[in-house]
Amino acid sequence: AWYLDKQLDDYASDARPDDLMTPVAQSLSEDDRAAVSAYYASLAAPLRVARGQVSVQDIQKGAAIARAGSPEKGLPACTNCHGPDGTGNPPSVPYLAGQYANYMVLQLDRWKRGQWDNDFGGMMSAIARKMTPEDMRAISEYYKRVANPLTTKDPQ
């Protein structure tokens, strides 16, 4: 819930401008935004089936960057901030494990192009500028396949 709550707050304050979400978030009180976040966090995550072709080499490349970074490109390991299991560090560092790959690529691309600036100290913007589209896809496809205990509900 904390990540969605932060995003709604960022939409409401215009730190994350969006033609659709900004007016919606601005129409909600802080308590309403927290309630919406809690509601969505309580929903069981759907079964996720991987679509499309992704090579084992791409997933291995993503895992390597996630765990060790890419010193030659000046990329730190994702695990340095997002944790060894990719579950993040609330409230400022979101989880990556189990996240939709296309969503992650989109966010990284927006940081790279300077469209997002709501990350702490501009850290993700600086990192994304050093990434190739292939790096973004590899990391995103890797984390898509990492189980996240925070979002995986017990079916019982």
Residue locations for each model-derived region?
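C-terminal capping alpha-helices of c-type cytochrome domains
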Residues: 26-49, 102, 126-155
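Gly/Gly-Pro-rich "capping" loops immediately C-terminal to redox-active cysteine motifs
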Residues: 1-18, 22-28, 79, 83-113, ...
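Electrostatic cytochrome c docking/interface patches
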Residues: 42-71, 89, 148, 152-156
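The canonical Cys-X-X-Cys-His
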Residues: 36, 75-85, 139
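Short sequence/structural segments immediately N-terminal
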Residues: 1-3, 11-21, 28-35, 44-52, ...
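C-type cytochrome heme-c attachment and multiheme electron-transfer modules
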Residues: 30-32, 56, 66-71, 79, ...
